[in-house]
Swiss-Prot record:
GO terms for biological process: nucleotide metabolic process. It catalyses: dTTP + H2O = dTMP + diphosphate + H(+); UTP + H2O = UMP + diphosphate + H(+). Signal peptide: none annotated. It is found in: Cytoplasm. This is dTTP/UTP pyrophosphatase. InterPro entries: ITPase-like_fam, Maf-like. Belongs to the Maf family. YhdE subfamily. The keyword Cytoplasm applies. SUPFAM superfamilies: ITPase-like (SSF52972).
């Protein structure tokens, strides 16, 4: 049994396997449950970056909602889905499939300005939904081929859009950025907190939930 503290008598459900998104929510004091949200991330040709991340975030949130309801979750619980992409010269860079693709991405990013878009979607089982996107400009310093290979050898680029993680060793590749840092990591927390507040979920009005065998129930409130 896991005890979860959340505001407004509802649960926040993160439809993502990303440890970075979980870390960002935890750092802001939110408690939540995580569910898998496996969706195809194949994008149609010619789609804009903002439309791409908003669409994928919404699909992830809806997949997470279906999974949550199938496990007995409340229709009033809030499901959060997100997706992050890197855009360089109007080309969308996703997660590298292998080290060779990671090398190509990092070589292209070297000495250039790129843009990180994260789409954020909130849905519940009562039919309410919304999605938005946040963009941050990131300026890479010029990298040597040796630096690129050394970074790839750390294994860090494997599961990250654009083949780098600004919160880890990849931070040394960045000269500076303009906008939200948490957006580059995977979840724009300034935006997320504002939208959750609109949905009536904050860190006050606490209710105690128990999750047993995947089935949530309210135990009591303060």
């Amino acid at each position: 049994m896991v005890t979860i503290w959340l505001g407004s008598g509802r649960m926040l459900v993160l439809a993502s396997a990303s440890p970075r998104r979980a870390m960002l929510l935890e750092a802001e004091g939110f408690s939540f449950i995580r569910v898998e949200a496996d969706v195809s991330e194949v994008l149609p040709q010619g789609i804009s970056p903002e439309s791409a991340v908003k669409g994928l975030a919404l699909r992830k949130a809806q997949a997470g909602l279906n999974r949550w309801l199938n496990h007995g979750g409340s229709r009033e619980d809030i499901i959060l889905g997100a997706d992050t992409i890197v855009v360089l010269n109007q080309q969308i860079l996703g997660k590298p499939r292998d080290e060779e693709e990671a090398e190509a991405m990092l070589t292209a990013l070297s000495g250039q300005t790129h843009y990180v878009y994260t789409g954020v979607a909130l849905v519940n089982g009562a039919g309410r939904q919304e999605c938005g996107a946040v963009c941050t400009a990131v300026f890479f310093r010029s990298l040597t081929h040796e630096e690129i290979l050394e970074y790839i050898a750390t294994g860090e680029p494997v599961d990250k859009a654009g083949a780098y993680g600004i919160q880890g060793l990849g931070g040394h590749l960045v000269d500076h950025y303009e906008g939200s840092l948490s957006n580059v990591i995977g979840l724009p927390m300034e935006y997320v907190k504002e939208r959750l507040s609109v949905w009536g979920m904050g860190l006050g009005d606490i209710a105690l939930h128990e999750v047993k065998d995947g089935l949530p129930s309210v135990k009591g409130s303060t």
